[in-house]
Amino acid sequence: MNPRQAEVERNTLETQIRVTLNLDGSGQADLHTGLPFLDHMIHQIVRHGLFDMHIQAQGDLDIDAHHTVEDIGIALGQAFARAVGDKAGIQRYGHAYVPLDEALSRVVVDLSGRPGLIFAVEFPRAQVGDFDVDLFHEFFQGFVNHAQVTLHLDTLRGSNTHHIAETLFKACGRALRMAVAPDPRMAGAVPSTKGTLTL
């Protein structure tokens, strides 16, 4: 299989973002989003997905974190789509349940070529530190729209907002790792009766 790597730059009047992604990495992260809690969460995707990822971001954080969080999701989605390519010879589907103490989340993904986000998550608190956890929806929406995947995120239980968020991101990493994994029995074929997952 060819190297599954990508680099994306996204520059607007609101944000300047560079993302590099290697799907066949070892869980190495170099994350500089300007938002420490977001770095911590994306690190969970990297470590549990066994991806290598670098993110350098500058945004209008003096106004709000919204643009930065959403645009990082967009750039990461673009990098993911480029790295995974035509999806020939991969599993396509992935799922994971991840607990952390009292919290339990389930993530299911289909590299379908059709963007769709189901975000069935309730956070008991609006913030962790000074990070607005409502922005996680914007992060995943940006990712889904540009990765062209269907993603279901469900929190099954939990009372600690940090724990809930961490289980979501860990499960997302593990589900994506499963979905992009090579399937030798596919013999390089695209896992769809349509013969394509890019149209």
From Swiss-Prot:
Q: Name one GO molecular function term.
A: imidazoleglycerol-phosphate dehydratase activity
InterPro entries per record = IGPD_sf, ImidazoleglycerolP_deHydtase, ImidazoleglycerP_deHydtase_CS, Ribosomal_Su5_D2-typ_SF
**GO biological process assignments:** L-histidine biosynthetic process
Q: Is Amino-acid biosynthesis a UniProt keyword of this protein?
A: yes
Q: Where in the cell is it found?
A: Cytoplasm
Q: Record's family? A: Belongs to the imidazoleglycerol-phosphate dehydratase family.
- Write down what this protein is called: Imidazoleglycerol-phosphate dehydratase
Instruction: Give the organism's phylogenetic lineage.
Output: Bacteria, Pseudomonadati, Pseudomonadota, Acidithiobacillia, Acidithiobacillales
